[in-house]
């Protein structure tokens, strides 16, 4: 058996020696296949994608065309009616609120108006307290002590009476008009008082002037007469 095997082994060894470069190349190929297994899988995936890509692209294009047709032909399908109605009602409410705010004038609960009062006569102290009652409004004028210096010349003094009032906004014009009327009445009364005082002064002057001529009618002794009387007394 050994003799029979020996020639076979020799032949096989010879064949192996001859096939050594081929074995090396095969081993290299096997090594490359073992190392680059993921590349083959990747290539398979790429092959599948390349194979099915045109069908996927066609499906997407067809779906986009269908959506565009539905959007332009039936836009109500893409918008809910409840949302539209709520949005429109909110817009209308906002517009109505803005118009109301624009129509209503700004409310000032406390207003201060300055009313100039011109006086043509002189006094020492005066206190002004005039409650004014208006329809649905109440206005109170602050009390002020007016100090005016004594003088013979007539001086015009301007006094600003600040009126603090709680007035409803639509009736402010009426209240201001009434305050101005009251100020005009005061001016008229002041003029009448000044006129009466002037008349009184004129009457007093006339009375004094009427008494002065009576005094002038009395005899007035001159210096010479006084000297003669003194001499007569000496002689006696």
UniProtKB/Swiss-Prot annotation:
GO cellular component: membrane
Topological type in the membrane: Single-pass membrane protein
Primary subcellular site in the record, as a coarse category: membrane
Subcellular location: Membrane
Membrane-spanning parts: 52-72
Sequence ranges of Low complexity compositional bias: 196-212
Chain residue ranges for the region called Disordered: 183-236
Keywords, comma-separated and alphabetical: Membrane, Transmembrane, Transmembrane helix
Protein name, entry field: Uncharacterized protein 060L
């Amino acid at each position: 058996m050994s003799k029979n095997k020996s020639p076979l082994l020799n032949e096989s060894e010879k064949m192996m020696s001859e096939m050594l470069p081929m074995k090396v190349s095969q081993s290299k190929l096997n090594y490359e296949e073992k190392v680059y297994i993921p590349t083959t899988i990747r290539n398979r995936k790429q092959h599948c994608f390349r194979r099915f890509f045109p069908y996927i692209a066609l499906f997407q294009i067809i779906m986009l065309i269908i959506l565009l047709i539905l959007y332009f032909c039936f836009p109500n399908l893409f918008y809910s009616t409840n949302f539209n109605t709520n949005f429109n009602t909110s817009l209308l409410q906002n517009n109505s609120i803005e118009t109301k705010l624009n129509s209503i004038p700004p409310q000032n609960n406390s207003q201060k108006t300055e009313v100039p009062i011109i006086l043509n006569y002189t006094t020492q102290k005066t206190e002004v307290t005039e409650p004014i009652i208006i329809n649905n409004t109440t206005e109170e004028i602050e009390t002020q002590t007016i100090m005016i210096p004594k003088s013979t010349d007539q001086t015009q003094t301007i006094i600003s009476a600040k009126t603090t009032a709680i007035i409803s906004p639509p009736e402010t014009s009426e209240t201001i008009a009434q305050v101005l009327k009251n100020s005009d009445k005061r001016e008229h009364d002041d003029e009448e008082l000044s006129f009466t005082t002037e008349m009184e002064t004129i009457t007093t002057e006339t009375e004094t002037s009427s008494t002065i001529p009576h005094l002038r009618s009395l005899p007035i002794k001159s210096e010479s007469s006084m000297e003669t009387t003194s001499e007569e007394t000496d002689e006696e």
